[in-house]
Amino acid sequence: MEIQKYNLSCIADRAYSMGFVLLQACNTRYIRPYGKLMQHQISYAIKNEKGKIDNYAKFVDQLEETLLDVQSAKIGLEPAELKLKTMNEWWLIGKYAKENNCVDDIADVFCSHKMTTSNYTENIGPYTFVYSNCPLISDPIDVYLVK
């Protein structure tokens, strides 16, 4: 994976699906104490001619094998073990993510008071969404209708 070229340390608060894959590609993986991870089996929806579907299914099989190899090598599992764990979604929180070697350590991070209390806005249609500059606060702190 491209991300593996760089010596990146990553901190996860939520890493679901492809976020889980990206976290496993990081050199050093951290999770917040109540951070959450989830990985699931590869899934897709498709409709087309049978030949195209068959070819695409082979491609998805290749992709699944590649992603299982990358993730299982970092976690220390056999690909078949990881495939079984992710069959019906594999959810982990904080210390359990560390116990299962999905992260290297637990790290609690905080935003400064200045970052937490400053904000930015996004206008979407008739609404203005106000967000904190702290990336740990993902939901809008205010939403109002533009008049």
Language model: regions and residue ranges:
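N-terminal organellar transit peptides
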Residues: 1-147
